Amino acid sequence: MTNCIVELTDGIFKQYILESKKAVLVDFWAEWCNPCKILAPILEDIAKEYEHKLIVTKINIDKNPNTAPKYSIRGIPALLLFKNSELVGTKVGALSKVQLKDFLNLYLK
């Protein structure tokens, strides 16, 4: 993981989302998840391209088991987009870069 992506924990998740001035994209992932590994470099690219309006974060569901159930996460990778502290969009599964950009552009105009 690069410095462009913020690693969240159960302990700081809610506070981080509430205090962020930018939109926050959260990737719920696990080390054993192959689609998560495919998505990781795409998220790094997105973090750089959208740095002026978006913060990309990750939360490992094995190390932080309390946050995912609060958002009914049943499959990973799961991407949740928060804007002004509110959940505005969700995507489950590995997306291509084009699909992810299309998803983000719906909400980050």
Curated annotation (Swiss-Prot):
Under the heading Pfam families, the entry gives: Thioredoxin (PF00085)
Classification via PROSITE patterns:
THIOREDOXIN_2
- Species of origin reads Buchnera aphidicola subsp. Baizongia pistaciae (strain Bp)
Q: Does the keyword Protein biosynthesis apply?
A: no
A GO cellular component annotation here is: cytosol
Name the Gene Ontology molecular function terms of this record: protein-disulfide reductase activity
Which Gene Ontology terms describe the biological processes this protein takes part in? cell redox homeostasis
Please give the function described in this protein's UniProt entry.
Answer: Participates in various redox reactions through the reversible oxidation of its active center dithiol to a disulfide and catalyzes dithiol-disulfide exchange reactions.
Q: What is this protein called?
A: Thioredoxin
Sorted alphabetically, which InterPro entries does this protein's record hold?
Thioredoxin, Thioredoxin-like_sf, Thioredoxin_domain
Keyword line: Disulfide bond, Electron transport, Redox-active center, Transport
Q: Per its UniProt entry, which superkingdom is the organism in?
A: Bacteria
Name the protein family: Belongs to the thioredoxin family.
Q: Which residues form a coiled coil?
A: none
Gene name, Swiss-Prot/TrEMBL: trxA
Does the record carry Transport as a key word? yes
Disulphide connectivity of cysteines: C33-C36
Q: Which residues form the Thioredoxin domain?
A: 2-109
What NCBIfam families does the entry give?
Answer: PRK09381.1, thioredoxin
